[in-house]
Amino acid sequence: MNDVSKASLPKAIFLMGPTASGKTALAIALRKVLPVELISVDSALIYRGMDIGTAKPNADELKAAPHRLLDIRDPSQAYSAADFRRDALAQMAEITAAGRIPLLVGGTMLYFKALLEGLSPLPSADPEVRSRIEQQAAELGWEALHQQLQKIDPVAAARIHPNDPQRLSRALEVFFISGKTLTELTQTSGDALPYQVHQFAIAPASRELLHQRIELRFHQMLASGFEAEVRALFARGDLHTDLPSIRCVGYRQMWSYIEGEISYDEMVYRGVCATRQLAKRQMTWLRGWEGVRWLDSENPDRARKEVLQVVGAIAD
């Protein structure tokens, strides 16, 4: 697409970043001064009843700046990147038709990629192949399968944690079915996003600062009643650790504590470590992201002004 035709497209803003980087606060501040409507891009915030551990915006924040695509699934339900793309495009069209600008905010980079580039023609799931992978995992462990993926598709392996069996088995399954790696196939995208997108990423200047923010927020969640929230989910009886919702960072570790598998202190340690690992994967995505402008989360006022400098002209 040439620059002239691209300039004629409706405008959209991406505000991306690792967990605990201040994305939500910046998005809310921007909504006060720009004609934008917020769309959440977060695979955990979609779930009802999962508020504290996901750092979901509170009632006052949502009143000041409503977020779309929050609380749209029960924790027992699945939600894919394809589901997100469909829902986000519908919301973006509605916002644009009302003469406003969609501001998509979150840290689920796979969703941003699916929205921006379209979805790749990946092979359908094969129960027989998946069963063989799971049998191999039972015999050798998921760490061994992750090492196998590193040899087959090092790019995908860098983004998939060894403790994420769903994504790990899918990456291997795609290769065994098609003979092509997940990375190869995802480079062949579907329909690109029909918007002129201004992309921003917000993060602290150093990894140490991000780690401090992560640890502080995890302890704030605990003080706010995170354990009671997960106990309520546990008491339902229909949820388990094979579900994407319960595998969310923090929830998986608290679940293990409630089941008596680990101590409270171990839960806290693992929860903080898992959140740091998530942030590392998010930063890996973002460092390779084209066309993104970086903002410093330690200076939110300056970050807001930098966005306004770029976006102010398109909002007039």
Swiss-Prot record:
A GO MF label? ATP binding
Cite the binding residues for substrate: 19-24
Q: State the Gene Ontology BP annotations.
A: tRNA modification
Q: Where is this site: Interaction with substrate tRNA?
A: 108, 130
- Catalytic activity as recorded in UniProt: adenosine(37) in tRNA + dimethylallyl diphosphate = N(6)-dimethylallyladenosine(37) in tRNA + diphosphate
Keyword annotations for this protein, in alphabetical order, are: ATP-binding, Magnesium, Nucleotide-binding, Transferase, tRNA processing
The record, for InterPro entries, names:
Dimethylallyltransferase, IPT, P-loop_NTPase
Q: Region annotation Interaction with substrate tRNA: residue ranges?
A: 42-45, 166-170, 247-252
Keyword Translocase carried by entry = no
Where, in this chain's numbering, is ATP bound? Answer: 17-24
The EC number(s) attached to this protein equal: 2.5.1.75
Q: Which cofactor does it need?
A: Mg(2+)
Question: What function is annotated for this protein?
Answer: Catalyzes the transfer of a dimethylallyl group onto the adenine at position 37 in tRNAs that read codons beginning with uridine, leading to the formation of N6-(dimethylallyl)adenosine (i(6)A).
Q: Which family does it belong to?
A: Belongs to the IPP transferase family.
Q: Self-association or partners: how does it assemble? A: Monomer.
Q: What's this protein's name? A: tRNA dimethylallyltransferase
Q: Which organism is it from?
A: Salmonella agona (strain SL483)
Gene name per UniProt: miaA
